[in-house]
Swiss-Prot record:
Allows the formation of correctly charged Asn-tRNA(Asn) or Gln-tRNA(Gln) through the transamidation of misacylated Asp-tRNA(Asn) or Glu-tRNA(Gln) in organisms which lack either or both of asparaginyl-tRNA or glutaminyl-tRNA synthetases. The reaction takes place in the presence of glutamine and ATP through an activated phospho-Asp-tRNA(Asn) or phospho-Glu-tRNA(Gln). It comes from Herminiimonas arsenicoxydans. The gene is gatC. This is Aspartyl/glutamyl-tRNA(Asn/Gln) amidotransferase subunit C. Its EC number is 6.3.5.-. GO terms for molecular function: asparaginyl-tRNA synthase (glutamine-hydrolyzing) activity; ATP binding; glutaminyl-tRNA synthase (glutamine-hydrolyzing) activity. It is an enzyme of class 6 (ligase). It catalyses: L-glutamyl-tRNA(Gln) + L-glutamine + ATP + H2O = L-glutaminyl-tRNA(Gln) + L-glutamate + ADP + phosphate + H(+); L-aspartyl-tRNA(Asn) + L-glutamine + ATP + H2O = L-asparaginyl-tRNA(Asn) + L-glutamate + ADP + phosphate + 2 H(+).
Length: 100
């Protein structure tokens, strides 16, 4: 898959980003490079390859990863924070509607 310059200009218009012609061309080259890399990765046969939880484990299988336990380190201060909030309901913060 590759993009054309018209695609980049349309995307920049949708994202409301002003790009010069030079910037559009540079962005086109970068995006097409990314798509080429994704196509290369998609072409690799990964049948039978086990997913890794950490990439270094594949290189150094004897290394024990020093991952800390997932423990709470901060006290629950929701009530304190909600006392100074303008509006709350059932433990949630109420905010003005921003999208119609």
């Amino acid at each position: 898959m590759s993009l054309a310059l018209s695609d980049v200009k349309r995307l920049s218009m949708l994202a409301q980003i002003d790009l010069t012609d030079a910037q559009s061309a540079q962005t086109l080259d970068k995006l097409n490079g990314i798509f080429a890399l994704v196509e290369q990765l998609s072409a690799v046969d990964t049948t039978g390859v086990e997913p890794l939880n950490h990439p270094i484990a594949a290189l150094l299988p004897d290394l024990s990863l020093r991952l800390r336990d997932d423990v709470v380190s901060e006290p629950n201060r929701r009530d304190d924070y909600q006392q100074v909030a303008p509006a709350t309901q059932d433990g949630l913060y109420l905010v003005p509607k921003v999208i119609e």
